[in-house]
């Protein structure tokens, strides 16, 4: 059974990726769990700010929030990984500020969020290195550049 993706568009931002692009990025990141279900919700800054404030106590809209599901796999037909909330205006602004191709930045954040749903994290240096290495490898498969190549420090709105 393939990936079950629920794409919710609650953003008026221009130049959003297609559902097919989101699906391809998720399938790449979730190769180890191809039979999975997740929701991606695209939001504007007001909703992104509200969610980041409520769940992370941060007073700004971040690029991606991940909400892993807490339902045992054996209770479901398809394992529910969780939800990703992506703030479209933040993604566009970051791509411009960081001089990254917009589609490459979208791909990176979707892959990054999916890896969080799989349990990867970047709280300590060793975990960050493992997660970032995997992100680089997956993005390279798509022909996208290393998203961390120009980073002097941790990106300011990277989501846990």
UniProtKB/Swiss-Prot annotation:
<dbReference type="GO" id="GO:0005737">
    <property type="term" value="C:cytoplasm"/>
</dbReference>
<dbReference type="InterPro" id="IPR002036">
    <property type="entry name" value="YbeY"/>
</dbReference>
<dbReference type="GO" id="GO:0008270">
    <property type="term" value="F:zinc ion binding"/>
</dbReference>
<dbReference type="InterPro" id="IPR023091">
    <property type="entry name" value="MetalPrtase_cat_dom_sf_prd"/>
</dbReference>
<keyword id="KW-0698">rRNA processing</keyword>
<dbReference type="GO" id="GO:0004222">
    <property type="term" value="F:metalloendopeptidase activity"/>
</dbReference>
<keyword id="KW-0479">Metal-binding</keyword>
<comment type="similarity">
    <text>Belongs to the endoribonuclease YbeY family.</text>
</comment>
<dbReference type="GO" id="GO:0004521">
    <property type="term" value="F:RNA endonuclease activity"/>
</dbReference>
<protein>
    <recommendedName>
        <fullName>Endoribonuclease YbeY</fullName>
        <ecNumber>3.1.-.-</ecNumber>
    </recommendedName>
</protein>
<keyword id="KW-0862">Zinc</keyword>
<feature type="binding site">
    <location>
        <position position="112"/>
    </location>
    <ligand>
        <name>Zn(2+)</name>
    </ligand>
</feature>
<keyword id="KW-0540">Nuclease</keyword>
<dbReference type="GO" id="GO:0006364">
    <property type="term" value="P:rRNA processing"/>
</dbReference>
<feature type="region of interest" description="Disordered">
    <location>
        <begin position="141"/>
        <end position="160"/>
    </location>
</feature>
<feature type="binding site">
    <location>
        <position position="116"/>
    </location>
    <ligand>
        <name>Zn(2+)</name>
    </ligand>
</feature>
<keyword id="KW-0255">Endonuclease</keyword>
<keyword id="KW-0963">Cytoplasm</keyword>
<keyword id="KW-0378">Hydrolase</keyword>
<feature type="binding site">
    <location>
        <position position="122"/>
    </location>
    <ligand>
        <name>Zn(2+)</name>
    </ligand>
</feature>
<dbReference type="InterPro" id="IPR020549">
    <property type="entry name" value="YbeY_CS"/>
</dbReference>
<comment type="function">
    <text>Single strand-specific metallo-endoribonuclease involved in late-stage 70S ribosome quality control and in maturation of the 3' terminus of the 16S rRNA.</text>
</comment>
<dbReference type="Pfam" id="PF02130">
    <property type="entry name" value="YbeY"/>
</dbReference>
<keyword id="KW-0690">Ribosome biogenesis</keyword>
């Amino acid at each position: 059974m393939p990936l079950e993706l629920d794409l919710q568009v609650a953003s008026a931002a221009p130049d959003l990726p297609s559902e097919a692009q989101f699906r391809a990025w998720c399938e790449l990141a979730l190769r180890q769990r191809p039979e999975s279900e997740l929701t991606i919700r695209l939001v504007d800054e007001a909703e992104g700010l509200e969610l980041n404030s409520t769940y992370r106590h941060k007073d700004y809209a971040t690029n991606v929030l991940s909400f892993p599901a807490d339902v045992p796999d054996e209770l479901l037909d398809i394992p529910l990984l969780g939800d990703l909330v992506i703030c479209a205006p933040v993604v566009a602004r970051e791509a411009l500020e960081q001089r990254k191709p917009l589609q490459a930045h979208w791909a990176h954040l979707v892959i990054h969020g999916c890896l969080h749903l799989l349990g990867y994290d970047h709280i300590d240096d060793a975990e960050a290195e493992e997660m970032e290495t995997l992100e680089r490898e997956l993005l390279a498969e798509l022909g996208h550049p290393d998203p961390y190549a120009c980073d002097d420090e941790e990106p300011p709105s990277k989501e846990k």
